[in-house]
Structures are given as structure tokens and as C-alpha cells.
Amino acid sequence: MRFQVYSRKLVIMMYFVDFDRTAFDTDSFIEYLKTHPVAGQFSQLPEPELAVALNAAVADGTLSFAPGELSHFLYEDAGRFLRDKENGVMLITYGNEALQRAKVESALHGIPRISTIYTGEVRKGEYLAPHIGMYGQSPVFVDDSIIELETMMDTCPGVVIYEMRRDGGAGDGRWPTIDLLSKLSI
């Protein structure tokens, strides 16, 4: 019998890390889109309508991102965290799968061994609930969205939850708040 070793790090803790506004500077990305040759035509749309237009453009192939094109939108501490934790991290992202996949694959180009869960329009806690037991005791979930944090709390009670506040503002108060992934205390 032959075994392949993919990583020498023993995974003791599993981290589920949100992509937009937790690992990826979505607000700067939206500003960048205003100058993008394809996406720029949608620049005046409010964010919900912008998302619909971008989803359609990715789906029909008129909008794509080159490998690494979006890597500078990955928060610096997020890149270090992902490289350090390797197989102990799963990115998890909500929203149109084609657009999310295009952003994630471009932003993470060059960072090996990172898995991503695309939940589509299913809330992250609801998506993970049937499978959370596979990830050991007390997996960690980090997100900036209150609805995602609440859903995780309601559907996956054993998960340790952190609220990400990249703006340094006060959190909701129900969970520990961090502004950098390096501040995770677990």
C-alpha cells in the first residue's frame, strides 16, 4: 500500500473563514471594478444590482479575472494565515458560485492547499450543519456578517464563533470580535 503525504502539519483545529470582507477586501475590489474594462460599465449600480450584473457577466463569459489579478485584494494577514494553517483552513463563501469562484481562484493564485466551500444562496451554518461533526471538536468560524454568525450559532452550536470587524468598530457583542485573523485566540 502506498501513501502520499500532502502536508506535514497535523490538523488539530479546523478554521472556517469567510471570504468577502474577512479574507478579501471587497470594498477595494468594488472600487477596482469601476476601472475594469468589462465591469466598469456597471460601476454606477448599487451593490445588490452590481452583484446581479457581475454574476451575469461571469456566467456568460464576458467577465473573468486572470490568475493572481485579484491577489492584492487579499488582506495581508489573511494571506499569512492561509499559508500558515494550510489544510486547517477552509474558506467559505455565500453568493453566486460562478462570481465567487472567479474571485477566489484569482485572489488565491499561488497559495497552495486551500479548500473553498461555495454555499450558493444557502446560509453558511445551514450548509455546514449536516457535516460539521467531520471537522473535529470546536471548529472555528470567522465572518463579518451578523446573519451568517447568527445562523452558524443556531445551526452548529459546537462551533466557536468570531466576528470580523476590519473597520475596527465595535462588534455585535455576542461573539469575540477581531480585526485581524492573527488575533484568533484559538
Residue spans for each PLM region:
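Substrate-recognition/cap helix-loop segment adjacent to the acidic, metal-dependent catalytic center
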Residues: 85-90, 94-119
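Solvent-exposed loop/turn and edge beta-strand elements of beta-rich ligand-binding domains
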Residues: 22-24, 38-50, 73-75, 91, ...
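Short, acidic loop-to-helix structural element flanking the phosphoryl-transfer center
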Residues: 63-90, 122-129
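Short, basic/glycine-rich phosphate-binding loops at helix/coil junctions
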Residues: 50-65, 103-111
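Asp-based, Mg2+/Mn2+-dependent phosphohydrolase catalytic module
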Residues: 6, 10-13, 105, 109-141, ...
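Conserved Rossmann-like nucleotide-cofactor binding loop
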Residues: 22, 97, 147
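Active-site neighborhood of HAD-like aspartate-dependent phosphohydrolases
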Residues: 6, 10-55
